[in-house]
Structures are given as C-alpha cells and as structure tokens.
C-alpha cells in the first residue's frame, strides 16, 4: 500500500497521560506509570497551579518520545491546548481524549472523532 505511513513494530511502548490527579492516579494504580533512567515520567498531573505552557511542553515532549504509543488527554485539558492537538497529525503516538471526574466527555470537541467523521463522509461521497 503505497503512500501509507508505516507504524514501527516494537516489543513494548508506554501510555502517557496529561490529566487531573484522580485520573492519573487511577491509571498509575493500574500499572501504567513509568519513570525512566533520567527520572522522566510518562504523566503530567494538572491542577489549578499548572500553567498552559507546562501542559504544552508536556504534550510536545510526550509526542516526540519514541517510547510512547498513546497519549491520553483529559478533554478539558485538550481544550486548553486545542491548537496543538488539532495540528498533530502523526499516527504514533495516538492522541485520545478521555473524560475526567469533574468534566464529562463531549464528542463535539474531540478532534480525532471529527477527523474520522470527515474521513468517512468524504470517503462515502467519493464512492458514489
């Protein structure tokens, strides 16, 4: 299949998280957390003191790491850096927006879902 992006195969990859404390702790208790040899974690806990700049930096760092396959973002945090999330176009790491305890999930704001809807609507139109 010419023109398709290849996804490198590896034995293991990490899930990164940018979310509120309760969400991150839940995933850490499930065994998703990691601290590498340079003491870098695969998560950022966002609270009222976290700046948008820190969130942007964490997103850029996680999306550039080759050991991360998925980045989980609480949707309300993704809305803070929507321009970065919407402009991200690589297949790996995949960006998934998730709900949080205090902020419900709204499919209208999910950039991945809107891209899929556009793809299927464009595909269905081109097949007619």
Curated annotation (Swiss-Prot):
Keyword hit for Ion transport: yes
Q: What are the GO cellular component annotations?
A: cytosol; Golgi apparatus; plant-type vacuole; plasma membrane; proton-transporting V-type ATPase, V1 domain; vacuolar membrane; vacuole
Please give the Gene Ontology molecular function terms for this protein: proton-transporting ATPase activity, rotational mechanism
Q: Which Pfam families match?
A: ATP-synt_F
What Gene3D superfamilies does the entry give? ATPase, V1 complex, subunit F
UniProt main location, coarse: membrane
* Cellular compartment(s): Vacuole membrane
Q: Does the keyword Isomerase apply?
A: no
Task: Give the membrane topology.
Answer: Peripheral membrane protein
Keywords of the record: Hydrogen ion transport, Ion transport, Membrane, Transport, Vacuole
Give a short account of what the protein does.
Subunit of the peripheral V1 complex of vacuolar ATPase essential for assembly or catalytic function. V-ATPase is responsible for acidifying a variety of intracellular compartments in eukaryotic cells.
- Assembly and interaction partners: V-ATPase is a heteromultimeric enzyme composed of a peripheral catalytic V1 complex (components A to H) attached to an integral membrane V0 proton pore complex (components: a, c, c'', d and e).
Per the record, the similarity remark reads: Belongs to the V-ATPase F subunit family.
Q: What is this protein called?
A: V-type proton ATPase subunit F
What organism is recorded for this protein? Arabidopsis thaliana (Mouse-ear cress)
């Amino acid at each position: 299949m010419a023109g398709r992006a290849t996804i490198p195969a590896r034995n293991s990859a990490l899930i990164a998280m940018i979310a509120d404390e309760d969400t991150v702790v839940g995933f850490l208790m499930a065994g998703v957390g990691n601290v590498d040899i340079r003491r870098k974690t695969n998560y950022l806990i966002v609270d009222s003191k976290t700046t948008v700049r820190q969130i942007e930096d964490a997103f850029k760092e996680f999306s550039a790491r080759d050991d991360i396959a998925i980045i989980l973002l609480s949707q309300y945090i993704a809305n803070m850096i929507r321009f970065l999330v919407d402009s991200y176009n690589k297949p790996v790491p995949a960006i998934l927006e998730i709900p949080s305890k205090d902020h419900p999930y709204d499919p209208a704001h999910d950039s991945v879902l809107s891209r899929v809807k556009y793809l299927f609507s464009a595909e269905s139109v081109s097949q007619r």
